[in-house]
Amino acid sequence: MANFDIDDFLRNLTPCPGVYRMLDAKGKVLYVGKAKNLKRRIKSYFRNSKLAPKIHVLVKQICDIKITVTHTENEALILESNLIKALQPRYNVLLRDDKSYPYIFLSADDFPRLGFHRGVKQVSGQYFGPYPNIRSVWQTLKLLQRVFPVRQCEDNFYRNRSRPCLQYQIKRCTAPCVGLISKKDYSQDIQHVVMFLKGRDQQVINELVIRMEEASGQLAFEQAAYYRDRIASLRQIQARQYISGEKKDIDVLGVALTEKMACVEVFFIRGGHNLGNKTFLPKLEGNLTPEELLSTFIAQYYLNRETPPILILSHQPKDMGLLTEVLSKQAGRKIALIKPVRGPKVQWIKMALANAKINLNQHLAEKSNITARFKSLQQLLSLANFPQRIECFDVSHIQGTATVASCVVFDREGPRKADYRRFNITGIIPGDDYGALRQALMRRFKKKEGVFPDLLVIDGGKGQINQSLRVLKEIGITEITVLGIAKGPERKAGNETLFLAGYENPVMVTSDSPALHILQHIRDEAHRFAIVSHRKRRAKGGKLSLLEGISGLGPKRRRKLLIQLGGLQEITRAGVEDLAQIEGISLELAQRIYDVFHR
């Protein structure tokens, strides 16, 4: 604060609502906040002797404050949320997982398709969700397909069918692609799907019971049995997912908190069904109350995101009225934030709180273990500072083909999978591991973007270390410590040899060392990720090479085949007649293509 005159700053500061950004000596944003009265709020940081220790540490680092005036406090709340997401300031509560959530999508076609969707809702149709993860979407789609045989195939596959596919044979689809069901009957199935996804499953069951009784009365026992099985399946799903007599869309939020770590558990209730839950572990700096944490979480998580009509909260934020107003305006309808004190909603909160506490305790135990191992690693390698970020590179190939390099990232929280990177290596001599490593490191560090690691771990010995040092020197990076971890005899864990850049002799370490354990963990994770990436590349490349080896199938025909059928997977699933319908593909050529993938 040596060069920052707070008195002069406050003299010229407006009492209007707005957002403030506190910066350090390097111009890096330390904290973003909102205020109904900017002058009063910022003044409180410098005139209040009862500030929390975290705030004292923050204030000492402030060298500048930037403000943005807004018309209303509502606008300030929205701007604050957007700036926190964009700038990731150290002293704000930060959500590490801000991915878009998956939905079940029902297309607007004449014969609609059920499928998975994530991202911007650009395609016309109906969206149901959000679901907490991809797995819960696929589980629901699988259940729906068993009860309502509505198509789930991609449009390219659907349009090019000349006969029913396997899904029809196993009674998971009614084959609208070849006209085996009328539009009226198919629409009835679609109506039932929509009713079910909106929580009106009992109404669907009632309709199916009427149909079953009608079929039985007409002595159509096979049809009656068909409806009976559907009803039984729906009741099984009800028993598994049902949570409430209220057929509403609700999110239930529970908070568990310690001095430096927090957990927010969100349960997704849609139409009375529990779709599952998701755990959030926000990054904290200093003490917060559960109410403050929940306020920040709601602003970051629900602004610019679809919000259900009701949020049930374990704690009541002070600015609940402001949050309600802003979220309602964003949604174009009333959003209710409720802190229940009695009734069934209290049981939902107990469920969310119990899960939040369990997940927080589990994460605390894991973090304590990782922190101890990082500390041991710092001591083993005589690092000046505690390692905040470790990156590990590994190269994978089979006899020099489809070479892939992986980069995994660990910090004191464990693996940061959002930062993992895969590099498809090209233009090298087959089997040249040094060349592959050089290319991967160049692509990772050349632009000097993102956060650099304190420690760079290479799966290999002195040769790989020297190659890494040459690349870093060429780029102009000198502050990264480089460590090689070479496999021991027979590749047994515990027999690894560690080589630290700049030292001739290996680092002496015992097999029970926590430092060695964390390095093994990171190395194994890099190896796993490299193998998975390599398999994906090899599988794709293998199928493409199979196409290239088919006599009479040149580049133009291959391209037409891929476009019209919608990719390699659809080509492998297509029959001879389907292939022959593509322009330029004769029946004889179609047979050759089919034979290649069905030997």
From Swiss-Prot:
Q: Look up the record and give one Gene Ontology term from the biological process aspect.
A: SOS response
**Key word DNA damage present:** yes
Sequence ranges assigned to domain UVR in this UniProt record: 202-237
Q: Name one GO cellular component term.
A: excinuclease repair complex
Q: Where is the GIY-YIG domain?
A: 15-93
Print the keywords alphabetically.
Cytoplasm, DNA damage, DNA excision, DNA repair, Excision nuclease, SOS response
Write down the InterPro entries for this protein, in alphabetical order.
GIY-YIG_endonuc, GIY-YIG_endonuc_sf, GIY-YIG_UvrC_Cho, Hlx-hairpin-Hlx_DNA-bd_motif, RuvA_2-like, UVR_dom, UVR_dom_sf, UvrABC_protein_C
Q: What is the annotated localization of this protein?
A: Cytoplasm
A single GO molecular-function term is: DNA binding
Q: Outline the subunit composition.
A: Interacts with UvrB in an incision complex.
Looking up HAMAP family in the UniProt record yields: UvrC
Primary role: The UvrABC repair system catalyzes the recognition and processing of DNA lesions. UvrC both incises the 5' and 3' sides of the lesion. The N-terminal half is responsible for the 3' incision and the C-terminal half is responsible for the 5' incision.
Q: Which PANTHER family match?
A: UVRABC SYSTEM PROTEIN C, UVRC/OXIDOREDUCTASE
The record's comment on protein family reads: Belongs to the UvrC family.
**Protein name per its UniProtKB record:** UvrABC system protein C
